[in-house]
């Protein structure tokens, strides 16, 4: 039986990053951008979010850590895609971020880079993170990305780190870790509505797609609010056509992205139709205990083919 997970949030939620680990061979150019850190917020039940990070030309980004356990997150812009990997050592509360602010997300942005310029490396600590964090930018050193099958290795050497705020030198350090990397795609929604609200006129104009080793998913965001999520495990080449029901707890409601509010739909279904890379997805009749009404969603949008191999479970 096809297994679909639908996640709805009717309140503002973090359109968080998701772990990905797939092989591709896209090469990225290197870019130099300096960033300053704005206000921060921290929600122990949801995600750590850095807000209002600005580059030298005033572009605003948000950085999101998915959870305290994943230690991997997504760094993105509402208007321009950014690829990021960051991993934290929660014992020491130190995180290292590497990203390419110019990489467009019109395809899977997993790439192999021989060397990146050092201004794409930012370091910050959890302790300062919780207190209107100071960010630390490296002004020397480099890092490399290497790929072996589905495993990516990131190595940073000779990194001299300075505070962005006052430019005082903090340390000379290295980064050496192996972890998953993100794979993200954004594409415009052709048409759509959620509970009768037009997705386009409401500013909900993005269909975002991610993958993990055993999962591919697509969801719609509204300026940072996650309003719909569909997922099936262990398949490639996109989301299969068909009807997905609430049987076997396959439709889930999560309010505010907090697992404490996770509820299963007692009825309802979603249908997926496909014409090439264009999908029409309708969700109807969702009855969820404690939630008034029956949420519905309809959209037509494009998704790329997931033409890479999945690892064995």
Locate predicted features:
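Surface-exposed helix/loop patches within compact recognition domains
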Residues: 52-146, 191, 195-274
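Beta-strand-connecting loop/turn residues
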Residues: 150-152, 180, 214-215, 277-279
């Amino acid at each position: 039986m096809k297994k679909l997970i639908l996640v709805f949030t009717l309140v503002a939620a973090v359109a968080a990053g998701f772990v990905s680990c797939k092989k591709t061979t896209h090469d990225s150019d290197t870019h130099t951008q300096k960033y300053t850190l704005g206000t921060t917020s921290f929600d122990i039940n949801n995600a750590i979010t850095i807000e209002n990070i600005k580059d030298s030309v005033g572009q605003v980004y948000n950085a999101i850590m998915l959870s305290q356990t994943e230690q991997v997150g997504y760094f993105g812009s509402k208007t321009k895609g950014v690829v990021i990997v960051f991993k934290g050592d929660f014992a020491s509360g130190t995180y290292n971020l590497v990203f390419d602010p110019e990489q467009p997300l019109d395809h899977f942005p997993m790439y192999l880079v021989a060397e990146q310029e050092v201004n794409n490396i930012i370091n910050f600590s959890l302790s300062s993170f919780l207190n209107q964090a100071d960010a630390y930018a490296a002004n020397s050193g480099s890092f490399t990305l290497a790929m072996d099958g589905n495993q990516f290795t990131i190595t940073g050497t000779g990194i001299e780190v300075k505070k962005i705020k006052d430019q005082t030198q903090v340390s000379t350090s290295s980064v050496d870790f192996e972890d998953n990397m993100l794979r993200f795609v954004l594409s415009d929604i052709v048409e759509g509505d959620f509970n009768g609200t037009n997705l386009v006129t409401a500013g909900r104009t993005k269909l975002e797609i991610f993958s993990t080793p055993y999962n591919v998913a697509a969801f719609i965001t509204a300026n940072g609010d996650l309003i719909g999520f569909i997922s099936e495990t262990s398949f490639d080449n996109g989301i299969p056509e068909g009807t997905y029901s609430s049987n076997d707890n396959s439709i889930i409601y999560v309010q505010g992205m907090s697992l404490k509010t996770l509820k299963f739909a007692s009825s309802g279904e979603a249908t997926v139709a496909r014409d090439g890379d264009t999908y029409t997805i309708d969700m109807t009749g969702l009855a969820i205990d404690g939630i008034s009404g029956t949420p519905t969603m309809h959209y037509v949008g494009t998704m790329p083919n997931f033409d890479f191999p999945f690892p064995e479970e």
